[in-house]
Amino acid sequence: MSIKSDKWIRRMSEEFGMIDPFEPNQIKEADGKRIISYGTSSYGYDIRCANEFKIFTNINSTIVDPKNFDPKNFVTVEDDCCIIPPNSFALARTVEYFRIPRNVLTVCLGKSTYARCGIIVNVTPFEPEWEGYVTLEFSNTTPLPAKIYAGEGVAQVLFFESDEICKTSYKDRNGKYMGQTGVTLPKA
């Protein structure tokens, strides 16, 4: 299994729609202002956060149960940024829609710009033949409110191509997060 380069990422996105919309360059400025970079890097792709957020709230005093998740645990926000309360959590989704080839697995790592501020971005691997918008998880580990910017980079996706095709892909087993179109809450 080997990591794939910018040339491969560009070809797979332009010819097969692996990433849509696809940015072939590394974008570091918008409207003359510095932003948190996104787009193609040497051996990965920096994904952006869309303007759709779900922020944890305790107004209903429920228990967080991944097998029986109550959507009332979140407040939905659509804005160009999201303020995550201290020691709290938010979900978002990517701007980009992904179509992962059958012989590819991705690993996604949060950008250091956010990590250095105590904001942890978690994304599970994109499995072979998974497709959809990626649900992003943000943890604010600080005692202060933390800001996430929509339309800017939040994490880097690394693509690994296997030497052989898997017997059963995510699509084959009807994965529960297949084809997600928005911020998707836990499913058991």
Swiss-Prot record:
This protein's pathway reads:
Pyrimidine metabolism; dUMP biosynthesis; dUMP from dCTP (dUTP route): step 1/2
Which EC number applies?
A: 3.5.4.13
Keywords on record: Hydrolase, Nucleotide metabolism, Nucleotide-binding
Give the GO molecular function terms.
dCTP deaminase activity; nucleotide binding
**Which reaction(s) does the protein catalyse, per the Swiss-Prot or TrEMBL entry?**
dCTP + H2O + H(+) = dUTP + NH4(+)
Please indicate if the UniProt record lists Nucleotide-binding as a keyword.
yes
The answer on whether this UniProt entry bears the keyword Nucleotide-binding reads: yes
Quaternary organization: Homotrimer.
Instruction: Please give the function described in this protein's UniProt entry.
Output: Catalyzes the deamination of dCTP to dUTP.
The molecule here is called dCTP deaminase
What is the native source organism of this protein?
A: Neisseria meningitidis serogroup C / serotype 2a (strain ATCC 700532 / DSM 15464 / FAM18)
Q: Which gene encodes it?
A: dcd
